[in-house]
């Protein structure tokens, strides 16, 4: 008997390995969550499990974020950004996102990506003439390989960040002279006249600064739109010389232009499907060329929150009442307690609802390049769907019809499943392989509402 027992045990293990757990079946989902909590102790085991949870059965649970982030896993050590630039981006993240990592609803910007680049090369040029109010110019080269073709520029600034605040005793008016130069070409390319574009921006220094931004959108917009990988620019400041007589004002500007290399900050709109598009959240109900008849027709089929509010036409309300009455007919013994019946079938104990799935990027050993958020809770839906689903779940009439088919006609037709009905986006601040810093907003990353379908 020992040999058949061993063979049976081997066969069960082999079958378990060959047929992955389906997240669409309720018992296996519960088992998968138990395994997930114990597997977080090991990075390899954790990724294997999370990859399974974010696979073809449940693409919305952990993908696309973990899949996108894992693409860089195992690369050589990443370049670390400048501390001042990192502090600035952390401050930007706090202004744009909550502690849970969701974009703040009171923000009205239409971009979903902010990239900060530090110069990959820096050279001093003309020494300048402080007596005439002209400060030394600096030659800068920025590499924009991380900007993708689906990212469109909204705004670009030169960012000066300081360890200590610089102060000015009185306002100082200056002009930033920016010269965009064409990169040098190899001898194999056809010779052409050198290209340069000069851009002047006027601004005024006031009081204390921990950072300073100079808008350079106009000269950079055509270069980013044409997907230029390298941007070569020369920057210098010219200030009114009569306002530089005060030593503190002159020293502050001198330290800023010589001791601090500016970063390039790009505000972009990622148009890919996995990015969060804030315009749709600001105008969720706007549809092109929609007449009154179309609006009435659409309102008859509400989903998500609209269905939860009970926005239905009278015709569908009558359909639901007739189906509900049909559901109440079958097989209720005369001696049965109606309250127990409704408790068992209409409101099951393991009711469909949201559950937490908390993970930490430090457990995945990704916290050295995922700066924020520190923790991620995608949440998931689990539980039994009641036989007569009402407005609370926002389920369509088809869900009730499916229940009737399962119970009366064909048991092979599955019962409605407990699935997410609504999601919220997630904001992520990460260090890229080249040492640049990226703030990105990902769509549909946190389940916020469950339904039965």
UniProtKB/Swiss-Prot annotation:
<comment type="subunit">
    <text>Homodimer or heterodimer (Potential). But, in contrast to other members of this family, cannot be disulfide-linked.</text>
</comment>
<dbReference type="GO" id="GO:0005615">
    <property type="term" value="C:extracellular space"/>
</dbReference>
<keyword id="KW-1015">Disulfide bond</keyword>
<keyword id="KW-0202">Cytokine</keyword>
<feature type="propeptide">
    <location>
        <begin position="28"/>
        <end position="318"/>
    </location>
</feature>
<dbReference type="GO" id="GO:0008083">
    <property type="term" value="F:growth factor activity"/>
</dbReference>
<feature type="glycosylation site" description="N-linked (GlcNAc...) asparagine">
    <location>
        <position position="163"/>
    </location>
</feature>
<feature type="glycosylation site" description="N-linked (GlcNAc...) asparagine">
    <location>
        <position position="236"/>
    </location>
</feature>
<dbReference type="Pfam" id="PF00019">
    <property type="entry name" value="TGF_beta"/>
</dbReference>
<feature type="glycosylation site" description="N-linked (GlcNAc...) asparagine">
    <location>
        <position position="269"/>
    </location>
</feature>
<feature type="glycosylation site" description="N-linked (GlcNAc...) asparagine">
    <location>
        <position position="255"/>
    </location>
</feature>
<feature type="compositionally biased region" description="Basic and acidic residues">
    <location>
        <begin position="318"/>
        <end position="328"/>
    </location>
</feature>
<dbReference type="InterPro" id="IPR017948">
    <property type="entry name" value="TGFb_CS"/>
</dbReference>
<keyword id="KW-0165">Cleavage on pair of basic residues</keyword>
<dbReference type="GO" id="GO:0005125">
    <property type="term" value="F:cytokine activity"/>
</dbReference>
<keyword id="KW-0732">Signal</keyword>
<dbReference type="InterPro" id="IPR029034">
    <property type="entry name" value="Cystine-knot_cytokine"/>
</dbReference>
<keyword id="KW-0597">Phosphoprotein</keyword>
<feature type="glycosylation site" description="N-linked (GlcNAc...) asparagine">
    <location>
        <position position="337"/>
    </location>
</feature>
<dbReference type="InterPro" id="IPR015615">
    <property type="entry name" value="TGF-beta-rel"/>
</dbReference>
<keyword id="KW-0964">Secreted</keyword>
<comment type="function">
    <text>Required for ovarian folliculogenesis.</text>
</comment>
<feature type="disulfide bond">
    <location>
        <begin position="385"/>
        <end position="452"/>
    </location>
</feature>
<protein>
    <recommendedName>
        <fullName>Growth/differentiation factor 9</fullName>
    </recommendedName>
</protein>
<comment type="similarity">
    <text>Belongs to the TGF-beta family.</text>
</comment>
<keyword id="KW-0339">Growth factor</keyword>
<feature type="region of interest" description="Disordered">
    <location>
        <begin position="282"/>
        <end position="328"/>
    </location>
</feature>
<feature type="signal peptide">
    <location>
        <begin position="1"/>
        <end position="27"/>
    </location>
</feature>
<feature type="disulfide bond">
    <location>
        <begin position="381"/>
        <end position="450"/>
    </location>
</feature>
<dbReference type="InterPro" id="IPR015617">
    <property type="entry name" value="Growth_differentiation_fac-9_C"/>
</dbReference>
<feature type="disulfide bond">
    <location>
        <begin position="352"/>
        <end position="418"/>
    </location>
</feature>
<keyword id="KW-0325">Glycoprotein</keyword>
<dbReference type="InterPro" id="IPR001839">
    <property type="entry name" value="TGF-b_C"/>
</dbReference>
């Amino acid at each position: 008997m020992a040999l058949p027992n061993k063979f049976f045990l081997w066969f069960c293990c082999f079958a378990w390995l060959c047929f992955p757990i389906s997240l669409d079946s309720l018992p296996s989902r519960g088992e998968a969550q138990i395994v997930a909590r114990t597997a977080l102790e090991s990075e390899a085991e954790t990724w294997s499990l999370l990859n399974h949870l974010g696979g073809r059965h449940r693409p919305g649970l952990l993908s696309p974020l973990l899949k996108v982030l894992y693409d860089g896993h195992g690369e050589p050590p990443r370049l670390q950004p400048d501390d001042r630039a990192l502090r600035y981006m952390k401050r930007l993240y706090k202004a744009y996102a909550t502690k849970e990592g969701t974009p703040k609803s009171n923000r009205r910007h239409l971009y979903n990506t902010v990239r900060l680049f530090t110069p990959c090369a820096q050279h001093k040029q003309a020494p300048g003439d402080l007596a005439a109010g002209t400060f030394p110019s600096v030659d800068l080269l920025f590499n924009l390989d991380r900007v993708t073709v689906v990212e469109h520029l909204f705004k670009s600034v030169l960012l000066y960040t300081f360890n200590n605040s610089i102060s000015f005793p009185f306002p100082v008016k200056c002009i930033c002279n920016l010269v965009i130069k064409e990169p040098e070409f190899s001898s194999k390319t056809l010779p052409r006249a050198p290209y340069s574009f000069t851009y002047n921006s006027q601004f005024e220094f006031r009081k204390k600064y921990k950072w300073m931004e100079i808008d350079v959108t106009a000269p950079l917009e055509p270069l980013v739109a044409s997907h230029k990988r390298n941007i070569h620019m020369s920057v210098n400041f010219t200030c009114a010389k009569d306002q530089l007589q005060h030593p503190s004002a002159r020293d502050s500007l001198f330290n800023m232009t010589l001791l601090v290399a500016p970063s390039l900050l790009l505000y972009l709109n990622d148009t890919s499907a996995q990015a969060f598009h804030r315009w749709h959240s600001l105008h969720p109900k706007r549809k092109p060329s929609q007449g009154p008849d179309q609006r009435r027709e659409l309102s008859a089929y509400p989903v998500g929150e609209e269905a939860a509010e009970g926005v239905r036409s009278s015709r569908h309300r009558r359909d639901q009442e007739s189906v509900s009455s049909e559901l109440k007919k079958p097989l209720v013994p005369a001696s049965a307690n109606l309250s127990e019946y409704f408790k068992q079938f209409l409101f099951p104990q393991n009711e469909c609802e949201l559950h937490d799935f908390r993970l930490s990027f430090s457990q995945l050993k990704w916290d050295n390049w995922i700066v924020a958020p520190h923790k991620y809770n995608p949440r998931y839906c689990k539980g039994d769907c009641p036989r007569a689903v009402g407005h609370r779940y926002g389920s369509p009439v088809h869900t009730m019809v499916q229940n009737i088919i399962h119970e009366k006609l064909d048991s092979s037709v599955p019962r409605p499943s407990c699935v997410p009905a609504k999601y919220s986006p997630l904001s992520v601040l990460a260090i890229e392989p080249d040492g640049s810093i990226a703030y990105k907003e990902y769509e549909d990353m946190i389940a916020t509402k469950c339904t039965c379908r």
